[in-house]
Every structure is written in C-alpha cells, then in structure tokens.
C-alpha cells in the first residue's frame, strides 16, 4: 500500500492528503451512501427509479505539514475517509433493498401496482453496514391520452462557396436519424427516467416543397451561397448576425410557410465554443404569440401577445418560425459544447416553449422556486456538477436551508446540461402540448401539405 500526502508549500495553505492506492478490504469500509435518480416515480411500469451506491473507506495515512509559527516541517499519521472507486469494491458486496427486504435487481425499481401517494423506503447494505434510507413517492399517472401529431421538418442547408471554405453536405439518412432521436426522447422511447412523459409528437422530414413539388431529397433544401453574398458577410469567425440577415433577405427560398413546416437552418455560423451552447450551437427564440382564446398567464415564463394566426407576412425574424443550428455541433456533439454534448432535442424543446433547467444564481429563480415552471424537474447550478449525477444546491443558496434540502438526482432531461438528454418530464410534456395547442406560430402539424403537396 502506498499513500502520498501532498504538501502545499505556501505558508497559509493547510495540509492536504491524497491517497493514490485505493485497494481495500470490506472491513475498511466506513459507510455507504445511497442516492436515487429522483424523489418521485411514475407507476406505469416503464419509468424506473435507479439507485446508486457510494462506498467510503478510512485508512491511516501520513500527513505532512508546516508549522505556521516555527516554519518547521512535520509528519503525522491521520485517518482519512475517501470515496472508493466502483472497481475496487468486491463484486456483489453492496446491494439495494426495498422496505420489505427484497433485493433490487440491477438497482432499479419499477411498478404498476403501487398506489399514487405511497411513500416507499429504500436502503443499501454491505456486510454489517447499512446506508441512509431514501424515500420515493409514487406520483399520479399522468394524462397521456393525447392525439399523436406529426410535425413536418425542412432542413435548409446553407452552403458557402467552395472557394471560401470547405464545402459540406448531409445525407437524408443522417437528418432522419437526428429527428428520430428527438422523437424518441420526446416520446419516452430511450430512457429510464422515473418521471419521463410521452408527448406523442413525431418529427418527420417533409416530402413536398412549398410549391407542392415532390422533393428529390426529403426534408433537405440546399442553399448555395454566392461568392458575393458570402463576401458581404465579412471576415469575422462569428457570422451569426450575417447568416440570420441572409435567411431573412432570401425568405422566399429559406423561410417556408410556418403553417406547413418547421424550419431548421444548418450553417457553420461561428467557430466559437461554449459549454451552454445557447448562442454557439444554436440560435432560437421561444414562442411569443398565443391565440386569443387562451389566457396569456396559462404558460408562464415567456413574453406573450395575443394573435389569431401567424403567417409568412408576420415574420420579422427567421427565429420566430424556426431555429438555426451550428453544423459543427450537429456533426460532432462535443465540438462546440465539450463534455456537455449537443443534442438537437434541446433547441427543439426550447422552440416549443420548454425552459432551461439550469440557473446561475439562486436569487434568480422564479416565484415557484425553480427555473422552468415544471415541478418535476430540478434546478441546479451547472458549474457545480459537470456530470449526469447532480444535486439541487445552487450558487448563493443559503447553507442548511430547511426549505430547500439537498437532494441528489440524475440528469436524463434534454434541457439539462451534462445529461443523457433522452427525456422530457411529465410536466414538461404537459407544457409542450399546451404550446402546440395555443400558439399559432407552432401549428405546422395542422397541415399535411408537406406530405401530400396539397393533393
């Protein structure tokens, strides 16, 4: 066994111990911590609650420091507790149990029989050590008797001149795969999220263009930018505004009727990177118009105005009826956002009125105490947890606040950073369906033109 203690030579720094060899035996394990994916579970037999164990051990190690008064170095033996890597724990040593002592196979729990409102208890055990107990509340089965809707999508691929930059193209198969994954995430097809909803929304490539002609390549409209137009965009590596202006200027070719199509523009509009991706991976606006039959306050968190319809003549910015995606992010999900991999499902959800779950400061949360008006999603400070495993503590949150207990969770949500991005929650689905029903600029699904050409 080799233990090394790092000494910070600065006189004001306190000693720091680092254990490099973590091989342990069961009798060295000091405690077991149990965490769950969430605190509520939908009892439909499909949603699953995953449990995760964290095993800690203690060892005596040599710690070296420097006396602040005498400036002399010293060494002493101290006891250190550390998180044991999973591959160092004996196989099968730690198991998760329900409240009547049944072992959870693979650490997951699903149910169709537990009554909504029931609070279940779970714990982990290894040897003679037992973890903390976790409570999971069975929630009401959500209303999911929605009529399935199909949203026709056209990708406008903005290609710069070959003399200016390397050209590019995307296959129809690639675009279909992108939309399929979005549909699967929205419809609870690829997740174990314990609170996943089923939006019953399917995205498909349009097969007819705006003139009613059969498209040679479904859902794909190529726009070859001329040398002069590309030159007019300037030499900056960030061409976000020039591209948006270009789309609006060429609206007859690049903005198809929002009552028939969802427009997505693909372009390498910037080489900048950011972990959030909200300006570098995509450019979009949330919905802004609501039909007068509905109360503007019915969908909180967005600035609304009443409008009976929304047509091409109403478009003042292309982002009112679509969004622009950076090709670099679509091709290589880590290229622009790093380990917070880009997913087309994120701007798609945002386009339909779903809000970001992250927040930067505790004091900026809304009156409901979260960031997105969806009670079954967690708000979190994304700077604290660059991982799918997170907690709800926020920058600026009072420590030990009894009204906001520390809760761990797992990120499945398409709006979470550092997430599996394979799910919408039940409450997010409810909000999305309200937007689809109430917002005229999001009514492309009401027309079958994109699939029939008007025939």
Which role does the model predict for each range below?
Residues 323-424:
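The catalytic-center signature of Zn2+-dependent metalloproteases
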Residues 109-118:
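Surface-exposed, short loops/turns at beta-strand junctions within beta-sandwich domains
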Residues 28-95:
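Solvent-exposed, low-complexity, repeat-rich "mucin-like" stalks and linkers
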Residues 88-93, 97-110:
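Surface-exposed, flexible coil segments in extracellular/virion-facing regions
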């Amino acid at each position: 066994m080799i233990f090394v203690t790092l000494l910070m030579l600065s006189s004001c720094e306190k000693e720091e111990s680092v254990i490099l060899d973590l091989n342990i035996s069961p009798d060295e394990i000091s405690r077991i911590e149990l965490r769950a994916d969430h605190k509520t579970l939908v009892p439909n037999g499909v949603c699953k609650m995953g449990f995760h164990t964290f095993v800690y051990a203690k060892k005596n190690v040599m710690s070296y420091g420097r006396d602040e008064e005498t400036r002399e170095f010293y060494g002493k033996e101290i006891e250190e507790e550390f998180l044991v890597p999973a591959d160092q724990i004996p196989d099968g040593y730690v198991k998760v149990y329900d409240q009547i002592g049944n072992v959870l196979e693979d650490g997951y729990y699903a149910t169709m029989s537990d009554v909504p409102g029931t609070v279940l208890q779970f714990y982990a055990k290894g040897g003679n050590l037992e973890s903390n107990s976790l409570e999971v509340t069975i929630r009401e089965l959500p209303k999911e008797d929605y009529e399935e809707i199909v949203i026709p999508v056209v990708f406008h691929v903005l290609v710069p001149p070959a003399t200016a930059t390397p050209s590019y193209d995307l296959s129809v198969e690639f675009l279909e795969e992108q939309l399929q994954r979005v549909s699967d995430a929205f419809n609870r097809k690829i997740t174990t999220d314990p609170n996943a909803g089923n939006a019953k929304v399917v995205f498909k490539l349009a097969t007819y263009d705006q003139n009613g002609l059969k498209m040679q390549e479904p859902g794909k409209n190529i726009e070859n930018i001329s040398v002069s137009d590309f030159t007019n965009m300037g030499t900056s590596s960030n061409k976000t505004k020039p591209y948006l202006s270009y789309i609006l200027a060429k609206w007859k070719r690049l903005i198809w009727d929002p009552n028939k199509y969802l427009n997505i523009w693909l372009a390498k509009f910037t080489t900048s990177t950011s972990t959030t991706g909200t300006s570098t991976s995509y450019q979009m606006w949330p919905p802004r118009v609501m039909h007068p039959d509905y109360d503007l306050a019915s969908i909180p968190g967005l600035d609304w105005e009443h409008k009976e319809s929304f047509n091409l003549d109403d478009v003042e910015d292309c982002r009112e009826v679509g969004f622009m995606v950076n090709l670099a992010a679509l091709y290589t999900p880590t290229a622009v956002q790093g380990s917070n991999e880009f997913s087309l499902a994120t701007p798609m959800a945002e386009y339909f009125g779903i809000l970001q779950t992250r927040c930067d400061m505790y004091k900026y949360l809304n009156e409901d105490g979260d960031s997105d008006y969806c009670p079954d999603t967690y708000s979190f400070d994304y700077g604290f947890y660059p991982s799918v495993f997170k907690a709800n503590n926020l920058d600026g949150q009072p420590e030990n606040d009894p009204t906001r207990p520390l809760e761990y969770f797992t990120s499945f949500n398409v709006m979470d950073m550092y997430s599996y991005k394979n799910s919408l929650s039940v409450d997010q689905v409810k909000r999305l369906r309200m937007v689809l029903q109430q917002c005229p600029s999001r009514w492309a699904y009401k027309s079958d033109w994109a699939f029939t050409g008007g025939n």
